[in-house]
Amino acid sequence: MATHRKHLVRDFNRYITCSICRGYLIKPTAVTECLHTFCKSCIVQHFEESNECPECGIQVHETNPLEMLRLDKTLEEIIFKLVPGLREKEEHQESEFWRKHKIKSNGEDGPRAKKSRLSGEDDDGNGGDYHRSDPQIAICLDCLRNNGQSGESIVKGLMKKFIRCSTRVTVGTIKKFLCVKLKLPSSYELDVLCNGEIMGKDHTLEFIYRTRWRLQGDSAYPMVLEYRPRIDFG
């Protein structure tokens, strides 16, 4: 009778560990050019210094390798099922991170401060949660003005530029919010920048805060995002 060997977690380590930090893949993120996968935070930090894949050395992108990254949710779920307690550990660490940086929704940013809802609508009492159970972040949306820039006359500053929203909100959603608030056509193209760098539409506020803004130091709060009419460099 054939015997069946019970597989151990270590049998799969080569597929579920990050070659940069040597730990289990956290938010596994694949490089689309070569499909090598790393922890999201590891590969983002690597691309701050290099535009080559740390595994095979292929040039990922000449100017912005971050655009060539894709989160692998399927692999993430597989890893969580293979490694007992990993999901709970990561959720706890993430919660502690946001608590430490005072980004959880636990009060106003300043005396009697008023914040706009990212939905751009008043609460109608219908029970929509707008991700209110998520960790929250306060941001400042500032209009970036360049003298003589085309389209500047219709892109104004917001009356209430401080808002609080979920850390999972993407730049694409921020752009839609700005179009609503500024009464711009839904097809109007805007650039959203952090520290002078244009952010991709799929970047979340959490991602931007961790990889771009927190370099300013703990005292730099809230996070400032600037917007302007889109500039076509082509």
UniProtKB/Swiss-Prot annotation:
Gene3D superfamilies: Phosphatidylinositol 3-kinase Catalytic Subunit, Chain A, domain 1, Zinc/RING finger domain, C3HC4 (zinc finger). This is Polycomb group RING finger protein 5-A. Residues 97-130 are annotated as: Disordered. The gene is pcgf5a. GO terms for molecular function: zinc ion binding. Keywords: Metal-binding, Nucleus, Repressor, Transcription, Transcription regulation, Zinc, Zinc-finger. Pfam families: RAWUL (PF16207), zf-C3HC4_2 (PF13923). Component of a PRC1-like complex. The keyword Repressor applies. GO terms for cellular component: PcG protein complex; PRC1 complex. A zinc finger (RING-type) spans 18-57. One of its GO terms (biological process) is nervous system development. InterPro entries: PcG_RING_finger, RAWUL, Znf_RING, Znf_RING/FYVE/PHD, Znf_RING_CS. Component of Polycomb group (PcG) multiprotein complexes; the complex class is required to maintain the transcriptionally repressive state of some genes. The keyword Transmembrane helix does not apply. Transmembrane segments: none annotated. It is found in: Nucleus.
